[in-house]
């Protein structure tokens, strides 16, 4: 059976991969000229890559890690030491670390927290631990139930001191969903904390060794095409065409550069588009179906990713850093963390500006200037003096609608991969799966979509979703 998939991000490509495994013929259509969706990247005139986001692979990403294994590209993940490193704004140029020892979970996480005396006092650690007990004891059902609260509200409910939010969770909230704790659903942070505490290597981080379209998406494309599938770029979906009974008749693809529109048909159809464009594409007869009503409550969150090249090394740290800056979220010196971007003499900082709502409409020059002011606080030793570090060039990548904005109540808006339309399915990290808006969530949604199709139309099975895998 032929299955046409709109969208070549991780959800669409993962869906196609697992459909190919189950004996289907997937045909993936991507509207842009680059693969990857939210992990897309481009090369500039100097041959330097710039990316949509700063992409981190966690040990708590079992389906993503399984995918790397199945593609035989595990060596492309560059694992970092098991730590979480925070800037200390009150002591510019210094860091506070949570180092996880090589012992079983949750003991390793508790030791990491107890050893850190820079950010939290002992009474605060005890209050935080007591506040977390319901989530640890009651598990996922409690975590899901807390979707009615923001993280700030949940912390107040649990009598956790507000300073803990300021010291740790503003940074974590911005890293997970690009918004602040007074907006983000408590479910998001509790889910992350649960995975990090329950799995020995859950919070261990890896960087991809190069640009995602080449190092992750292309192996997926090769895998799909070797098994009879197809992947096409520059194929924007214009309209979902319907039969009289409301099922899908075909995908109308907009012709580019003067070419005529074309209709692509198949036995089954998948949307692996982000939720915002999907909402605009829903045909009128479908709008009363529950899943298409549900998604009206979802919208993508804006985010800005910056790349800044300097004339010297600003840091030797080979890891993700939590800036704890009012403007920025996480950042890394990619000349240290990523093999393809390696440079022993010059830094290339990749930084996430979040929340980005007030900045998405500003010029690149304004954004770079504001970011540079923050960088001077992060690396004062390189900017104070007679010979300050010099910015050589920059790239700013704006995503007005990224992952869905995970405010309270959004869990109820996330649809299943099956729809009320018998030949139409959904994939995307906004669909219901337990890893929320993330690369793992995208891969898992694609796998779950393929599993649903295989269960409905083919006795061959897709490999089961993974719970935990061991990482190096």
From Swiss-Prot:
Inhibited by the herbicide norflurazon in a non-competitive way. Its cofactor is NAD(+); NADP(+); FAD. Pathway: Carotenoid biosynthesis; lycopene biosynthesis. It is a peripheral membrane protein. FAD binds at residues 7-23. GO terms for biological process: carotenoid biosynthetic process; response to herbicide. One of its GO terms (molecular function) is phytoene dehydrogenase activity. Keywords: Carotenoid biosynthesis, Cell membrane, FAD, Flavoprotein, Herbicide resistance, Membrane, NAD, Oxidoreductase. Pfam families: Amino_oxidase. One of its GO terms (cellular component) is plasma membrane. Belongs to the carotenoid/retinoid oxidoreductase family. This is Phytoene dehydrogenase. It comes from Synechocystis sp. (strain ATCC 27184 / PCC 6803 / Kazusa).
